[in-house]
Amino acid sequence: NKFGFFPSVAAGWRLSEEQFFKEAESLSFIDNLKLKASYGILGNNNIGNYPYQSTYALGKAMNYVFGGVYTQGAAVTTYVDPTLKWEKTRTTDVGIETAFWKNKLTFNAAYFYRKTTDILYKPSASYSSIFGLALSQVNTGSLENKGWEFEIGHQNKVGEFSYHVNGNFSIIKNKVISLGVGDVEQKSGMIGNGSNLFLGYPMNMFYGYKTDGVFLTDEEVKEWHDQSKIAPNSKAGDLRYVDISGDGKVDEADKAYLGSKIPQYTFGLGLG
């Protein structure tokens, strides 16, 4: 599947240019009012050259005996997925652009929804070594990003002095929809990069043990749940870990979602 089709479309309606809008005196303070929307599909094939071809290697391990003679051999070293195709990202945007009082005040807002499917990645430790071959790039998993973007600005001129102020604020929510490979949760990432991947949670999440303050005395250590498996020799001043499973001890079963490495809120401010 070396070829792909990635259409896009965008439309806008500037209401402030309509005759009915210009004739409305109550709306004269609005210089610009525009509604806009877009939809598009982007493709990603950033996986190197010829990922759809199997590779062969020469070496002693591939040699073979023919007619009593030890002969140079070659063998396939990489298994290629014959259904490999483009990773696709579908994006929908809707928004509004406004300007008021001779463009002294501007305000823009937009909502976006972005879904990525057939994510390309190359497994490393996610399959058995008994297989005997390396795996090429494969398509698996999907995720979504959605959120809001806001921008507000003010510009003016006082005598010979001109200035402008603008600020922006965005909200984004990231969620793993599918992991492929049977939706097996990846506690160390699909490619062994330490990023925990769980269905319904953000990518690059923090996954670990919850704490409940620190031990104030050694007596508290004795009365607390057994946490010797993760923090042996705990004493006063050490962290107290929560027994989420309720089995009286703190171990691997007590790990939980702690948050995302991807910031949910971002903002900026500009002056000039």
What are these regions (language model features)?
Residues 82, 246, 263:
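Single, functionally critical "micro-switch" positions that shape active/binding sites
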Residues 164, 260-272:
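Conserved C-terminal beta-signal and adjacent last beta-strands/turns
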Residues 50-51, 138, 157-260:
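Conserved small-residue
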Residues 1-199:
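Extracellular/periplasmic, surface-exposed regions of secreted and cell-surface proteins
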Residues 116-117, 259-261:
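A short local loop/turn or secondary-structure capping micro-motif enriched for an aromatic residue
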Residues 80, 95, 251-254, 266-270:
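Short, hydrophobic/aromatic alpha-helical segments in well-folded domains
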Residues 69, 206, 210-211, 266-268:
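Disulfide-bonded cysteine-rich modules in secreted/extracellular proteins
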Residues 54-56, 60, 213, 245, ...:
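Generic alpha-helical secondary structure signal
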